[in-house]
Each structure stands twice: as C-alpha cells, then as structure tokens.
Amino acid sequence: MLILRGAPALSAFRHSKLLEQLSQKVPAVSGLYAEFAHFAEVTGVLTGDEQQVLARLLKYGPSVPVQEPTGRLFLVLPRFGTISPWSSKASDIARNCGLSKIQRLERGIAFYVAGQFSETEAQQIADVLHDRMTQIVLANLEQAAGLFSHAEPKPLTAIDILGGGRAALEKANVELGLALAEDEIDYLVNAFNGLKRNPHDIELMMFAQANSEHCRHKIFNASWDIDGESQEKSLFGMIKNTYQMHSEGVLSAYKDNASVIVGNVAGRFFPDPETRQYGAVQEPVHILMKVETHNHPTAIAPFPGASTGSGGEIRDEGATGRGAKPKAGLTGFTVSNLQIPGFEQPWEVPYGKPERIVNALDIMIEGPLGGAAFNNEFGRPALTGYFRTFEQSITTPHGDEVRGYHKPIMLAGGMGNIREEHVKKGEIVVGSKLVVLGGPAMLIGLGGGAASSMATGTSSADLDFASVQRENPEMERRCQEVIDRCWQLGDKNPISFIHDVGAGGLSNAFPELVNDGDRGGRFELRNIPNDEPGMAPHEIWSNESQERYVLAVGPADFERFKAICERERCPFAVVGEATAEPQLTVTDSHFGNNPVDMPLEVLLGKAPRMHRSVVREAELGDDFDPSNLDIGESIERVLHHPAVASKSFLITIGDRTITGLVARDQMVGPWQVPVADVAVTATSFDVYTGEAMAMGERTPLALLDAPASGRMAIGETITNIAASRINKLSDIKLSANWMSAAGHPGEDARLYDTVKAVGMELCPELGITIPVGKDSMSMATRWNDNGEDKTVTSPMSLIVTGFAPVADIRQTLTPELRMDKGTTDLILIDLGRGQNRMGASILAQVHGKLGKQAPDVDDAEDLKAFFAVIQGLNADGHLLAYHDRSDGGLLTSVMEMAFAGHCGLSLNLDSVAESSAEIAAILFNEELGAVIQVRQDATPDILAQFSAAGLGDCVSVIGQPINNGQINITFNGDTVFEGQRRLLQRQWAETSYQIQRLRDNADCAEQEFDALLEEDNPGLSVKLSYDVNQDIAAPYIKKGIRPQVAVLREQGVNGQVEMAAAFDRAGFNAIDVHMSDILAGRVDLNEFKGLVACGGFSYGDVLGAGEGWAKSALFNSRARDAFQGFFERNDSFTLGVCNGCQMMSNLHELIPGSEFWPHFVRNRSEQFEARVAMVQVQESNSIFLQGMAGSRMPIAIAHGEGHAEFESEEALLEADLSGCVAMRFVDNHGKVTEAYPANPNGSPRGITGLTSRDGRVTIMMPHPERVFRAVQNSWRSEDWNEDAPWMRMFRNARVWVN
C-alpha cells in the first residue's frame, strides 16, 4: 500500500465552521487541521514516470498552503470491506491514464485535533467527523491497509419454524426489523409448513420488504368500517374513480413506475444511433409524471435522505415503459418549527425532539442541499417546490397534543418524456437475460421499506440509521445515458422490461420484474456486482444501494445492449434468466446452496387484506379574532413565516437551466425574485409548445376540516398552474401524495373522508384525473424525554402536483408588475366570495392560534369558470401580471408582485371591506383566488367577462402599482398601513438569509441581503453591439455545407444535448463523441472542424472539477496525441463550457497561447451557484465573440467550482493585459464586479471567460448554449423574436469556418 499526502481538505470558511462545531461539543478542542490522505493498492513497484503521473493525478483543487500537522489524528476512511464511489471513479481515471499497476485508489481525511481530551471526548469528536453508515475513524495512517483486505462472505441463516414454530418467526421479526404484522406471521408459518422446510433469513427479509406498507400500500387497499358503517370503496378505489370518470389524455396509470399523459408533437432532438449525428425526429413527445416522498431517511440523515429521494424518483421516470427520459424536477419540504438561533420567532414554542432524528433547522440546511446536489449532478433542472413549517399544540377531545412535522415530508417529483411505442412494457421471452444496470451492492439502506413503514421511534436507532441509503448521482447519469441510447433505437430498443431498484433492493425489484412479465426467474447471487464481499446472502439481496435498475433483455438483443453499456462505461451484470414457471430461485455458487427457492405466489400472492375499523372525531379548533391585531407587526410576522418568506436559499443551489428546455423557473423578472406560480418546459428546441407543473398543499387546514384541506390543495394547484397557457382544465392531471399518522385517534377517518372528497366528488366535478400518487402512513414521532412520553403527530397531509401540456410557452404569466405599460389596475378575484375564513391561516399560526373555520372550495363551477376566463384573457394578451392568493393571503400576493416589479403599491380596500374590523381578515385570509394586473382602459371589459362567467361578485379593483417604492393601503380615506418596499422585501427575505448565513459563506449571504436595500438597482438589462434578430450564418447555411463539430462528453457530463442543438441551429453537423470513443480509437478528431467540451460533472468531480477528465487526456498517449494534433491545426476551433471550461484549463500545456489561463476552484460562497448573471463581452481574438465586444447581457450560470485562481497576482495582471480575457461579470449598473451575487463565484476582476492568443480556443464558465432561444431565458427583452443574443456566438463560429 502506498500512502500519499494530499492538499488541505477544508477551506478557511469550512475550517472555522467545523472548529466551532467541535469546540461546542468538546470545549477542550483548541485547534484543527485537515488534509486529504490517499492510499493506493498496487500490484508492483511504480516507475519514476508512473510515480510522477500519480502525483499529478492526486494534486487537485484550490492551492491552499500545506501545514505540518500537530494534534491527535482522527483518520476518517470509508468503512473497511467497502469501495467508495470516489475510489471507483479515481481508480477508473488512473487506469485511463495508463497506471495499470494501480488496483485501487482510496481517499480519507486526516483530521489533526489539538487539545487535551478524554477518551469519551475523543469519541464525541469522532462522531462529529464521520458518517457512521459509510465511514470509520482510525488512529494512524498504517491502519488504512485494512481498506484493501478482502473479507470472506457470511453464510446463510435458517429460521427453525418447523421445530420452534411461530415463536421462532416472532423472534426473527424483531431481530431483523421486519415489521411483519400478526396475520403475515401466520401466513408465513403456514406457507413454509406447506413447503415442508424452514425459511432462510434472505426469504423473510425479501417478504418483509415486498409486503411492507411502503411497497404494498396496504392501508390504501384495505376495506373500511367508519363509525360502524361499512364503506363501499377502498382508498385506492376512490382515487381510481377519477380515472374511470375521465381517462382521456392518460396513456398509463397505476401500473408502472410513473404515469404517462399525452404530450405535444415536436422534433425530439437526439443523436442518430447509427451515425451519432444529432437531429430532430418529429413525433408525439408524451409526458411522464411522478412524485415520491422520502420522509423517514430525511429525518435520520437529511443530506443522503433527500439526495436518494430525488435519485429514486428520477429512476422511477427513467424506468417507465421500456425506458424514458427525466426532464425537470420539483422538491418540497414540510418540517416543524425552525427555531433559528438568534432569530427565534414569537410563535415557536420549544418542545424537544428524540436524539435519533435531526432538528428542523438542520433538515432545512442539509436536506435541500442533498436534493439539489443529486439533481445538479444528474443534470435535471429543479423548477418548482414548496416549503412549509408547522408545529403547534392543539386541543382535541382527548386533551392537548402537539401536531407538527418532526417526521418531515421530503417530496421529490418531476416530469419526463417518453416515446409512444415505449409507453407499454414489452414481453419478457423465456430465456431473457435479467440484468442489473448501475452501481454495486453495498451494505446500505438495509430494511428501508419496512423502516419507513413504522412510526419514527418504534425501531432501534441502529436499524433506523442502517435504513438510509447513500448517493452517487454520476452513476445514475451513466445509467440514464444507457437508457437514452436504448429508447433512441425506437423499435430496435433492446429493453423489453425495466424497473428501478428502490425499497427492498433487488429482493423487491427482480421478483416484481419477472412477476409483472408473467414469468419466473432463476438468479445467481454471486453475479450481483458487489463492493462489499463480506455481506451475508440476505444483505446482498435486500440492500438498497442506489443508482440501480433491473431489466429484461431478449437473447438476440443482448450484444447490442452490452456494447452500449461499454461505450457509456456503465457497469451491468447478467444476474439471471427468465423462466416459464412462476418460481423464484436464487443460487449461491460460493456456498453451493439455494438461498431462495419459492413459488412467486408465496412472496407476492394472497397475503391477507387489511381491514380498518375506525371512528370519526370532532375537530375543536380555537377562537381567533384578527380584528384588533396590529397590522404592521402582523405583516412582519407573516413575512417571516417560512411558508410565506422568500425561498431563495432553496432555489439558487439548484441548476434551473440545464437541458436548455426550461421556459419558466422560480426566479421572475429583471430582479430575479423567487415568486413564480408554475414551472414550464419546452417540448423541444423547435416549437413553442411545452409542459407545465405546479403544486398545491394546505396541510394545517386538516386540523379543522380534513376534506377542505384536500379540496384546497387541488384548488391551489389549479390557481398556480393557471399561469401557464393550457387549452382546457381537463388537460391537467394530478399526482396526489398522502401522508397520515395511521392509527392516531380520528386520523384514519380524516384520511378516508378526504380521499372521498377528492376522488369521488371534486375531481370528477372538475373533469380532472389523478393517475399517480404515493402514500406514507406513519407520520408520527415518539420518544421519552426524561421519563415523559412525548409524541409529535403530523396533520393528515395531501400534497398535490398538477401536470399539463402547454399550448404556448411564450404566454406564461408571472407575478412581475409591469411599470412600462401605462396606467394599470390590480384586480382581486376572490373565489371565497367574501367569506374570509381565517382558520389555520398563517396569520393565525404566527399568533399561536388555529381558528375555527377553514377556507374551502365551495363550488367546483367557480373554479372551472375562473380557469376558463384566465386562459381566455391570457390568450388575448390582456394580462400583464398574475399571482395566486395562498399562504399569507392577499397582502402577501400583492407584495410579492411589487417585489418582482421593483415598484410600490397603492391599495384601496373600499370595494372589499365594509368596516375597519374586516381589514385584517381581508388582507390575510387564504381563500382561493388571484390578483391580476391589467391596462386600466381594459378594466371594464375584463370585469364584464368575469360577470358573464358567473364570477361578478368575486372581482374588485383594489389598487394600482406606483413608481415611488412605497406600499400604501387605505380604507375610507384613512391609511391602514404604509411602508417602504425595499424594507418589506428585506423582512420577506430575512428567513432565507438567516439559513443561508448558517449554511454558506456568511460574507456572501450578507452581501446579497444588503443588496436588497439598493433602491436604484436597474435589474437585468441588455446592451448589444449587434442586431439580435440578424442571422449572419444564413448565407453559408443556404449553400448546404454543414461542417462537423464533435460534441465531446465524458462520464458524468450532462449538457451535451443543448450544446449540440445550438451548433445544429448555427449550421453545423453536431456529432456525439464520448471520451471512450477517443481512448478506444473509434473516432478521429481530424474529421472535425470544431470540438466542444460540455458542462456537467465528469467523474462526479472526483480529483477536481474537470481535472480527472483532463488528466485522462494528458496521460493517455492516444488521447494526448489526438487532442494535441487537433489544437495545433490552424483550421480548428474549440469551445469549453463550465465543466468543459474546467477541463480545458487543465489541458493548457497542449493548447498554444493559453499559458495565462487560470485553474477553476470552489466558489467563494462555498456553494453551488445557479443564477442569471450579467456579463460584458471583452475585446479579444475569440472567434466566437467577434463583433460582440462591449455587449452586456444576462447569461445562465450553474457551477460549484467557477472561481478563477491564478498562480499569482502577477499572473492575474499578465492575463488581464494579454487580451485573452473574453468575458467578465458586471453588476446591474454595468460595472465589472467581484461582489456577490453579481459575481457568483468571486473570480478576480470578474473574469469568467478566456481565449487563446489566436482566438481559436475559448473557455467560459457561463452557459450560452442554454439560452440561445429567447424563450429559454428566465427574463427576456421584448425586442427579441426567436433568437436570444447568445445565438450570435455559435453563428460566429459558422462564419469563421468559411
């Protein structure tokens, strides 16, 4: 084993944060130093050259001075017997660099902690420094040799029920954490007595996972008695009723990993499977919809819990039909009170929590980062979501109880696209290869299906922790590339059947796969790729290692499938084959036995149906009279409540422009304020049709009226999605996610009544279907606090997500008030018809109350009329701005509109209030509704249209936007409230700032928060030195000559399709080239005029962002010669964007005239930054930027490591004077800046793009390829037609070639 010291592992900011955390736990800690430690398992002595290559490989990241360590060593390493994702990628890179003697590289962190502390304190320090699920802590470097020792497999265990009867199974139930019900234990005892043998632990574990509440949805399929009366339908039956009543537009419901609905026809853009040339195929582009929850893991370990939640939902989409493509994501969180230190709110009453779960604040710091990190690295934009906190003591017929979300809701959802011929699963022919695609088995997430089906606190802490999985998104990206290559083959798609691997691991996925295909299966346990050879059979079969899919591939298609996997470097293994008889057999060649041998019907067959007998219980509520509240103080409290406050801290960490198909993200207008009602994507690059998704949830209402909370969730989904241009209401399809504390007094009946209200009444009345959903039935947390039993139970919670095809993405409405459209009016549409019910409103909550009467959808006809009128007005161009009314009421709606429009408001309540006692209720009630901005001369006609639709009593003109930055509210000539917009916006942004300050670099958070005080910020703007609507490449395109450009990707790159689309539109033939093609000699770069290295996360940023990719080119002789030859040709051009920019900067020794280029390292904010930034094009030789110098315009940025680090101040100065700086960040006033967030990564002198001296090679961190169409921009100028300013860059390259 070789030991190689690495660079310091912590930035100054992370170092001081960790030191503070350690000294809080152990006050004796006085100092800390941390550096990476690398370990290499080698098969022979390395030569001098090989040692040099290895040393260069392991020098990565920012240049931080190395110290001589002092203090006690805590060496944190991956758990012995496991291979970390870092190791498998770094070892791949080493092999690609020709280091054949390196068996394996592994990395740890050596923490040196100074101070005098006891062994107990040392243990506390170790607990802070490592993740006990995947890591261990050692005391010296030599002990790391254990990383490379190979454990012997553990044997199978039989449970003696033939001898020990039922008692033996009861004991195993507890020891293995199986969560089997009494009737299931009886069922298994009978089944194995019938088979005349004892079950093995692997069979019981498999049965428990496959039949857990999590997988089988027993409550939703149960029969019911309520108050002694038998109910006709199951919960699932009532949901299916929506489909039975209105199935049009639904292509797949209830039977696959996601639902499929009809989409628009467009030119689907992808590479031809034979020629690898990108092009558009005109066909129906159908829409996948899916929303999952990952509540239990997120409570225990928020980052991996939320990350694997997103990963699992992405796999559900990819594994729909015969393979599909995820497109855009959403995330939601509901937690208990945050209690931010130093920012505690008056309504937050501390109640405590159990040790085993994380507090609400830490869930909201770590969980969103996990979800965003997975989506970012996979390459899926996160475009909408919600965030709510709720925790309150309420009065019930049994006394007071605390209701809240100690067990959080973590929602991960999204939409994708699928080809028409792949919607239905294919046939599994006998003899089909049964394949596992993706990562290896590891001992993580064991028993997750069963664990998430229990109330938090009823299983042991170790079992809880063991049930959380760990993530490797770059592996999932590789799997998706394989799936993409397969569906792109059309009728030659080798995948006949596919499922994702989720709860229960392969023990659930493989039986489900063969059973759904009406087959049996014979499997060999030792064929499963395994990074933890010491596992017992049940651990190999049931672990929930992530990023895996199971597939059936026909024998004739297998070689083609294998070639695809090898090109994409995606691991796969043939684990078994399909059999005609429905028997499940798992053999074990190591021990020479059959761990599983049972009929499928024993596993998946007639396990007993659950019956629930429950009673209804009254909701008591409490008295809440808002009429005497101080309006100013109420506004501040409401604006601080997380459900109302800015969600900026959740949004800027998530890439929102990847794919180049995003037409509407959360950030609105020139000031990029996070208030959008709906997310919208384009169907493809050649059309204006698209897809929309929006959410609705009003969970606290369920404590007063559960059915009302369900109806309001659907109502809010409709008022949100109405901002997009949808042809008819019935085009909207819903996902329903149900959360309940089953068994808690009254909750089962509330769940039943709400499902009935939604499934049997409201949805059929609206003509809307719910083709997909999920349930989580154990939403309670129990613990003992110094002898006192405590429980926190969630309200019955329905989260609704709406999806729909969009007729015109250019007509999406936003809340941004327009001050450039003359005199305008604000009109309130109040679907509550003046009832102003205040129950469970944010205003009630921030005063510690619940109220009595919940808002509700009283008449489905009103909602239908509202939707139709809004769509008509939008189609006719009458609506300048639109925002729904929701949490925080009318006041929040209009303030958010003013924040987005950077303007003031003059509101007059005379038309809606009869007395001053009603004012608070009018401003803060959360009845359904919306506010629209219209031109004043059109107001009478618009009011008449509402009247004609039967909504005349619902509409009132309530005021106008004004230019002076003041928000004034009057009634009967008296001022009710006045305040400055910028100060109110700071109140609204403060909760987000407080969390950002704790999570990221506090200096950056403060700069962004203080920037809100700037009254004269002009926002995003455009100043061009050329005509955006002129196509300078048109003459060359007309000649029909299309030069070839190589669109280069490495494993983990995810931005290649939109890059190809931009070059294709500029008149190039874009060709898909994988690094594996170059390393294998399948592709010759001499055939190309251009080469473009795309964005993403090559090798998951292992060995530095873009550095592993670059080094596999530098240190592989074939690749090095290919790249060097290409760069030296005078007729070639090269572009590197984002990850491609980082990669190219590390190839500068091969690129003539690039000696000034910097190295790109971690952003100054220490965070992934996804924003729209202003840049200025500099005077340079870049062939891409000719004729653009001096232009200032917005561009998409999305990166974690974009800070340009030069070797010295002198090198920076030299680069600056060389004429090689091509692009700089500027602020909204047009000045070059280093200030955050205008300069999102803190690069010196705003440098974010450079070129070689002759201009043939250009690198940049921002993403022009995502914003070349006008509709791709989060904010766009009305002067742009089809093209955005960045299209010129690609056309410049086309002109240069000629």
Swiss-Prot record:
Single GO molecular function: phosphoribosylformylglycinamidine synthase activity
GO cellular component terms attached to this protein's record: cytoplasm
UniProt keyword Cytoplasm present: yes
Residues binding Mg(2+): D677, E716, N720, D884
Reactions catalysed according to its record: N(2)-formyl-N(1)-(5-phospho-beta-D-ribosyl)glycinamide + L-glutamine + ATP + H2O = 2-formamido-N(1)-(5-O-phospho-beta-D-ribosyl)acetamidine + L-glutamate + ADP + phosphate + H(+)
Location in or out of the cell: Cytoplasm
Keywords assigned by UniProt, alphabetized: ATP-binding, Cytoplasm, Glutamine amidotransferase, Ligase, Magnesium, Metal-binding, Nucleotide-binding, Purine biosynthesis
An individual GO BP term: 'de novo' IMP biosynthetic process
InterPro entries referenced in this protein's UniProt entry, alphabetically: Class_I_gatase-like, FGAR-AT_N, FGAR-AT_PurM_N-like, PurL_large, PurL_linker, PurM-like_C_dom, PurM-like_C_sf, PurM-like_N_sf
Active site annotation, chain numbering: C1138 (nucleophile), H1263, E1265
Residues that, per the record, bind ATP: 305-316, 384-386, 676, 886
EC number: 6.3.5.3
UniProt pathway: Purine metabolism; IMP biosynthesis via de novo pathway; 5-amino-1-(5-phospho-D-ribosyl)imidazole from N(2)-formyl-N(1)-(5-phospho-D-ribosyl)glycinamide: step 1/2
Top enzyme class: ligase
Occurrences of domain Glutamine amidotransferase type-1 (ranges): 1045-1298
Keyword Magnesium annotated: yes
A Pfam family: FGAR-AT_N
Superkingdom of origin: Bacteria
SUPFAM superfamilies noted in UniProt: Class I glutamine amidotransferase-like, FGAM synthase PurL, linker domain, PurM C-terminal domain-like, PurM N-terminal domain-like, PurS-like
Major localization listed first in the record, in broad terms: cytoplasm
HAMAP family, alphabetized: PurL_1
Family stated for the protein in its record: In the N-terminal section; belongs to the FGAMS family.
Role of this protein: Phosphoribosylformylglycinamidine synthase involved in the purines biosynthetic pathway. Catalyzes the ATP-dependent conversion of formylglycinamide ribonucleotide (FGAR) and glutamine to yield formylglycinamidine ribonucleotide (FGAM) and glutamate.
Summary of subunit composition and partner proteins: Monomer.
PANTHER family: PHOSPHORIBOSYLFORMYLGLYCINAMIDINE SYNTHASE
The protein's name in its UniProt record: Phosphoribosylformylglycinamidine synthase
Source organism (scientific name): Pseudomonas fluorescens (strain Pf0-1)
Record gene name: purL
